[in-house]
Amino acid sequence: NIWVTRNGGGSWNRIDSGLPQNRWVSSISPSKFQEGLVYATLNGYRYDDFATMVYKSEDYGATWTSIQGNLPNESNNIIIEDHVNPSILYLGTDHGLYVTMDGGSNWNLYQGNLPNVAIYDMVIQARENDLVVGTHGRSVYVIELEAIHDLAKPKDMVMQ
């Protein structure tokens, strides 16, 4: 179940009616940039359902949209938003780290110094511009985000 409060905890509303039911909520990540925007990942381990379930809501959970894009069909564990660019999202799955630079339409498997293993936790260290990734049994990794931010910058186009 996913619940939201808009009055400091005075009352709560359930907001998961537009999501697959009977699935574990593996992560919830509110946007730092847009009020009412929230990301959620679910998994179906209990039912041998390893489908990708990653969603966003822009209206406090009244409606949900899949942002699976071109992701492969695999369980996902955590999603977080970048601290500089709201279009960049990081998704930890059972087989590695995926990054989108367009809000979830197109995802790419991170090809850096990170093994393709289950990722269960992530946090951004804004001062250092690093993504800290916690894996299942393969340690903790620190990824410098400067290159990802550079890739996401608009490029000057030259018309011929």
Residue locations for each model-derived region?
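Beta-propeller blade termini and top-face loops
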Residues: 1-160
